[in-house]
């Protein structure tokens, strides 16, 4: 079963983000606890964590419940480029959240922010994946949808790289 924990409510469309309302850390904790007490998940996928307080609440819950598989998709920007994560939270993401991940799945702009480097080609994606892996996660998948040409994702597990390439599908969303 798919179960959700809401960390923020975002009002947005394809042109802009008009508002973000954070859910309190206490409410995040209650949601996570209620999920785990009912149906223990086989995997956890984490998306938008936009504040230090939200990241801390989620990280503490992960330490308590110790899920086997944790996928972190560090949602930092909306499709239109609007920021969804406060700049002061990026360090907390790197030091507190990323080390708890089985897999981190940033897109290119997010990988640039986390790895602290520009990405302009597949080689750069590999270097960024290694840099992010060194932050403590088990594996990294950099999503190449923001690059030009075919969409190529780069997966790195600490030992080997895999490239996954397909034709780009143009969408507004």
Please annotate each region the language model reported.
Residues 165:
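Residue-level detector of conserved, well-ordered beta-strand and adjacent loop positions
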Residues 168-173:
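Short glycine/threonine-rich catalytic loop with a Thr-x-Gly-x-Asp
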Residues 1-4, 42-43, 68-70, 83, ...:
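Structural motif
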Residues 16-22, 82-87, 116-120:
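Short glycine-enriched, charge-decorated loop/helix-capping segments at active-site entrances
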Residues 1-79:
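Conserved N-terminal subdomain of the carbohydrate kinase-like
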Residues 87-160:
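Conserved phosphate/ATP/ADP-binding segment of small-molecule kinases
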Residues 56-64, 152-161:
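Nucleotide and nucleotide-moiety/phosphate-recognizing core
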């Amino acid at each position: 079963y798919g179960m959700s924990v809401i960390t923020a409510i975002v009002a947005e469309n394809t042109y802009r983000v008009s508002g973000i309302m954070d859910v309190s850390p206490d409410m995040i904790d209650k949601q996570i606890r209620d999920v785990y007490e009912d149906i223990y998940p086989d995997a956890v996928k984490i998306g938008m964590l936009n504040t230090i307080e939200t990241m801390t609440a989620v990280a503490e819950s992960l330490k308590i419940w110790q899920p086997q598989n944790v996928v972190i998709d560090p949602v930092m920007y909306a499709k239109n480029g609007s920021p969804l994560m406060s700049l002061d939270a990026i360090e907390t993401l790197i030091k507190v959240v990323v080390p708890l991940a089985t897999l981190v799945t940033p897109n290119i702009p997010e990988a640039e922010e986390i790895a602290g480097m520009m990405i302009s080609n597949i080689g750069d994606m590999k270097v960024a994946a290694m840099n992010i892996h060194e932050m403590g996660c088990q594996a990294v998948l950099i999503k190449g949808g923001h690059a030009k040409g075919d969409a190529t994702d780069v997966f790195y597990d600490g030992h080997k790289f895999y490239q996954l390439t397909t034709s780009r599908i143009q969408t507004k969303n």
